[in-house]
From Swiss-Prot:
Catalytic activity: a (3S)-3-hydroxyacyl-CoA + NAD(+) = a 3-oxoacyl-CoA + NADH + H(+); a (3S)-3-hydroxyacyl-CoA = a (2E)-enoyl-CoA + H2O; a 4-saturated-(3S)-3-hydroxyacyl-CoA = a (3E)-enoyl-CoA + H2O; (3S)-3-hydroxybutanoyl-CoA = (3R)-3-hydroxybutanoyl-CoA
Residues covered by region (Enoyl-CoA hydratase/isomerase): 1-189
Gene designation: fadB
Gene3D superfamilies, A to Z: 1.10.1040.50, 2-enoyl-CoA Hydratase, Chain A, domain 1 (3.90.226.10), NAD(P)-binding Rossmann-like Domain (3.40.50.720)
Site (Important for catalytic activity): E119, E139
Subunit note: Heterotetramer of two alpha chains (FadB) and two beta chains (FadA).
Binding residues annotated for NAD(+), in chain numbering: M324, D343, V400, V401, E402, K407, S429, N453
Protein name as it appears in the record: Fatty acid oxidation complex subunit alpha
EC number: 4.2.1.17, 5.1.2.3, 5.3.3.8, 1.1.1.35
């Protein structure tokens, strides 16, 4: 044994090839300080070992290295620039040391080699992967750029254009795609990986492969003609800005760094990378995006914990077919849980099956599935008109029409059919879980399971705990949602649950602006372009359906009359009463036609302005700041109320619910991250300026206490 630590072991194999194995004590290899220090020591030990002719890097885990330990590095990001600069320089000395070894090196890659893992393999001369490998630099998704030489080495290995695409998108690449552009040198079956790596290394040792020329290319400036370089980077800037926009600076920084370092050798190019990394690490966007990553880990960790106390879900059922039922059936079946789809109407069953088939066909067209896989998924969906087909279901999802009496009747009927241990859930968006539980003999085996439309696209599922729901029931439904590929958050029962409860105060703020003469299209523009929502409130209401919004608004007003009850008609009432329901009937705030691809196309409709003008009088202009304040303050305060009342357990889960359920701008991190960025005291002062607008603008006593102590919702 040449070297051994808790994270790395180095041994000398036959033919004087050294094998360096990353093998941390946890379930995966990450680049933390301990691993980085161990790698440095291991390389020193190798340099002092006589007779070593080559080095193979490998992993003792299913994945090579999944990336940096973000939790550890967050503390570094808060340090002074010179401290961060020193850390980057020290870390990069280790990767340079690997790259400068006096013999050829190869990485044998299985599973994920992401972030720092990808930067490690780029520092070796050769790279071979098995069929399970996934390679990439996802740092831009966290609001930063690679910091261990990724922007320097990757362009010199695969060319500037390919590197720009890899790094700016942050997507991980399959081995076939990596081989095509030259990021790796071969792909082999998993059982052949290390044997093939040793053989390739032998070819380098015997100079059949010119490893020194490969290495020199990574140390030198990019070989791009000047005119071609100018055109390439100019085009990249335009394309990246179009996709990333002004709110996400990291992808554009990647283009600028690679361009600036193109004519430099390694040392100078790394300095360019370091400076950009430090600048981005200090931004609110990086804090927000890293926060989302950590919150996502927390929510997934809770789901894994729930799975340990959950009963197994080997078969499921959905009551009510159609688009929603078909979407739920598709999601369950495609993730391996067979499902029965029950309806009282054959036409609805056909619609549900067609929805599943349509989604599967789209996967085939994108190259993400095959006809054989499609057949397998469809075989996992059983359509039926007969309740008896549900007898074996471990979990039933009720997804019939949003009417309390209909749901109560269906739930009572299904309880008579399913097994003693079956769990029944309701996919309701507005009806109290405690109310529906009254129709059941075993309310402890019942909870809410609120999917968002369209089911296949929206990652969130709200699991609603009723007052009688058992912990095993909730845990089992959380585990089933996670098995379906969804992100489940547990919320306690209340009108609107969590997501809709905080959404409707936002709509109320929007309606208040319209009553005061604001232009809904101007509001949408501000909320989309400046605040960062994927859709402004008028457009979102049209997509949700103004009839649906009208009904949900009434539920919220009944549940929270002190602040959500209305005086007189608002804009939603005006549209609803004019039979303008949004996209579903081609007219809402906007009017809709169908484009060439069959998608709804939004256009301004003078009639909607006429209706609003008749109801509320002349239009007035409002500043962007006022539009943002009047729409966002009610949502933010209601989100805080949900935390204070225990409707949602943590700021992290609230923020994930908002990002995944509503499309809250990720670069702002969610309501609680946004509050911490603004400063709670600053927000309270802002809200107080609008307190005269009513109960939705009144901050809570606890918020005032937090503001007085300069507190925050996340640890500083």
């Amino acid at each position: 044994m040449i070297y051994q630590s808790p994270t790395i072991q180095v041994e000398l194999l036959e033919d004087n090839i050294a094998r360096l194995c990353f093998n941390a004590e946890g379930s995966v290899n990450k680049f933390d300080r301990e691993t980085l220090n161990s790698l440095n020591d291991a390389l020193d030990a190798l340099a002092q070992t006589q007779g070593v002719k080559g080095l193979m890097l490998t992993s003792g885990k299913d994945a090579f290295i999944v990336g940096a330990d973000i939790t550890e590095f967050l503390g570094l990001f808060a340090q002074d620039d010179n401290v961060l600069q020193g850390w980057l320089e020290d870390a990069n000395k280790v990767f340079n040391k690997l790259e400068d070894l006096p013999f050829p090196t190869i990485s044998a890659i299985k599973g994920f080699a992401l972030g720092g893992g990808c930067e490690t393999i780029l520092a070796t001369d050769l790279r071979i992967a098995d069929t399970s490998a996934r390679i990439g630099l996802p740092e831009t998704k966290l609001g930063i750029i690679p910091g261990f030489g990724g922007t320097v080495r990757l362009p010199r290995v695969i060319g500037a254009d390919n590197a720009l695409e890899w790094i700016t998108t942050g997507k991980d690449q399959r081995p076939e795609a990596a081989l095509k552009v030259g990021a790796i040198d071969a792909v082999v079956a998993p059982e052949l990986l290390e044997t093939a790596a040793c053989q390739m290394l032998q070819d380098a040792i015997s100079e059949k492969i010119d490893w020194q020329a490969r290495r020199q290319r990574k140390l030198s400036p990019l070989t791009l003609p000047k005119l071609e370089a100018m055109m390439s980077f100019a085009t990249a800037k335009g394309m990246v800005f179009k996709v990333a926009g002004k709110h996400y600076p990291a992808p554009m920084a990647v283009v600028e760094v690679i361009e600036k370092a193109a004519l430099s050798e390694r040392a100078e190019a790394l300095q360019v990378e370091h400076q950009a990394f430090i600048k981005l690490a200090k931004t609110d966007v990086a804090k927000a995006l890293i926060g989302i990553f950590l919150n996502d880990q927390l929510v997934k960790g809770k789901a894994k914990k729930a799975a340990k106390q959950a009963q197994a879900v080997n078969s499921a059922a959905v009551l009510g077919a159609g688009i929603m039922g078909g979407g739920i059936a598709y999601q369950s079946a495609s993730k391996g849980t067979p499902i029965v789809m029950k309806d009282i109407n054959q036409a609805a069953l056909d619609l549900g099956l067609n929805e599943a088939a349509k989604l599967l066909t789209a996967q085939i067209n994108r190259g993400r599935s095959t006809p054989a896989k499609m057949a397998g998924v469809l075989n996992n969906i059983t359509a039926t008109l007969d309740y008896n087909a549900l007898k074996q279901a471990d979990v039933v999802v009720e997804a019939v029409v949003e009417h309390p009496k209909v749901k109560a009747t269906v739930l009572a009927e299904v309880e008579q059919v399913v097994g003693e241990d079956a769990i029944i859930t309701s996919n309701t968006s507005t009806i109290s879980i405690n109310l529906l539980a009254k129709s059941l003999q075993k309310p402890e085996r019942f909870c809410g399971m609120h999917f968002f439309n369209p089911v296949h696209k929206m990652p969130l599922v709200e699991v609603i705990r009723g007052e009688h729901s058992s912990e095993e029931t909730v845990a089992s439904v959380v585990a089933y949602a996670a098995k379906m590929g969804k992100t489940p958050i547990v919320v306690n029962d209340c009108p609107g649950f969590f997501v809709n409860r905080v959404l409707f105060p936002y709509f109320a703020g929007f309606s208040g602006l319209l009553e005061d003469g604001a232009d809904f299209a101007a509001i949408d523009k501000v909320m989309e372009k400046q605040f960062g929502w994927p859709m402004g409130p008028a457009y979102l209401l049209d997509v949700v359906g103004l009839d649906t919004g009208h009904h949900a608004q009434a539920v919220m007003a009944e549940g929270f009359p002190d602040r959500m009850a209305k005086e007189g008609k608002d804009a939603i009432d005006v549209m609803f009463e004019a039979d303008r329901f949004g996209q579903k009937n081609g007219k809402g705030f906007y009017q809709y036609s169908v484009d060439r691809r069959g998608k709804p196309k939004k256009e301004v409709d003078p009639l909607s302005y006429e209706l609003l003008g008749n109801a509320f009088g002349e239009q007035k202009e409002f500043s962007s700041d006022e539009i943002i304040a009047r729409t966002m303050i009610p949502m933010i305060i209601e989100t805080v109320r949900c935390l204070e009342e225990g409707i949602i357990a943590t700021p992290a889960e609230a923020d994930m619910g908002l990002v995944y359920g509503l499309g809250f701008p990720p670069f702002r991190g969610g309501v609680f991250r946004y509050l911490d960025t603004l400063g709670v005291a600053n927000f309270v002062a802002l809200a107080d300026q609008y307190a005269h607008l009513g109960g939705l603008y009144q901050v809570t006593d606890k918020m005032r206490e937090l503001a007085a102590t300069n507190g925050s919702y996340y640890p500083a």
